């Protein structure tokens, strides 16, 4: 196998919708790399509605998969944008890249569920809150598995910086007392 420093790299993102994956990626040395992202294909579909992106998600995943496979075939270092919510498909894509001779890295972007839900609600292109909640439950399981099959996992916390008092105020439901 080629020296890891000379092998192409596949960087996989993981984190809930609205966790800040794109923002976190821009702050790394991987900023500017080609990104395989189903969301970038969605606006190209004639029936795309930013308020219901799930309607064209399967189509956009197929298009993104074609591009990802081209990068693997051509040996292009790239980023695969995703949530990591489905362990089987996340790990299968990792294994596919590994089999193609790539070094594998994961950028795991973490934020509190309340933060992700608030960011998601503020977006034009949002996903259903129950989807974000489901992702928050399954991503840690996926990462527990993926950690054993990748070369590096980088964790980035995108929670807003705040004082303890601010956090307590935002995370306490006064109706509970």
Located regions from the model:
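Conserved substrate/cofactor phosphate-moiety recognition/catalytic segment
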Residues: 22-78, 88
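Short catalytic-loop micro-motif centered on adjacent basic/acidic residues
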Residues: 78-83, 106
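Conserved GTP-binding G-domain of TRAFAC-class P-loop NTPases and closely related GTPase folds
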Residues: 4-11, 19, 30, 114-177
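Conserved beta-strand scaffold positions in the cores of enzyme catalytic domains, especially
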Residues: 33-35, 106, 153-155
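Short, electropositive alpha-helical surface patch
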Residues: 86-103
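P-loop (Walker A) phosphate-binding loop of NTP-binding proteins
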Residues: 16
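Conserved phosphate-donor/acceptor-positioning beta-strand/loop module used by diverse small-molecule
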Residues: 98-119
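Acidic, metal-coordinating catalytic cores used for nucleic-acid/nucleotide bond scission
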Residues: 81-90, 113
């Amino acid at each position: 196998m080629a020296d890891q420093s000379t092998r192409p790299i596949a960087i996989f993102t993981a984190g809930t919708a609205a966790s800040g994956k794109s923002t976190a990626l821009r702050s790394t040395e991987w900023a500017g790399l080609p990104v395989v992202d189903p969301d970038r294909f969605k606006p190209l579909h004639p029936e795309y509605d930013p308020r219901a992106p799930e309607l064209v998600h399967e189509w956009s995943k197929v298009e993104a998969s074609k591009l990802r496979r081209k990068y693997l075939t051509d040996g292009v270092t790239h980023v695969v944008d995703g949530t990591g919510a489905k362990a089987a498909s996340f790990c299968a894509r990792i294994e596919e890249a590994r089999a193609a001779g790539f070094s594998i890295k994961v950028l795991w972007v973490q934020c509190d569920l309340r933060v992700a839900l608030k960011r998601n609600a503020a977006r034009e292109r949002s996903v259903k809150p129950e989807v974000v909640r489901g992702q928050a439950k399954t991503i840690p399981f996926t990462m527990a598995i993926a950690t054993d099959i990748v070369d590096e996992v980088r964790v980035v916390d995108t929670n807003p910086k705040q004082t303890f008092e601010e956090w307590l105020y935002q995370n306490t439901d006064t109706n509970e007392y």
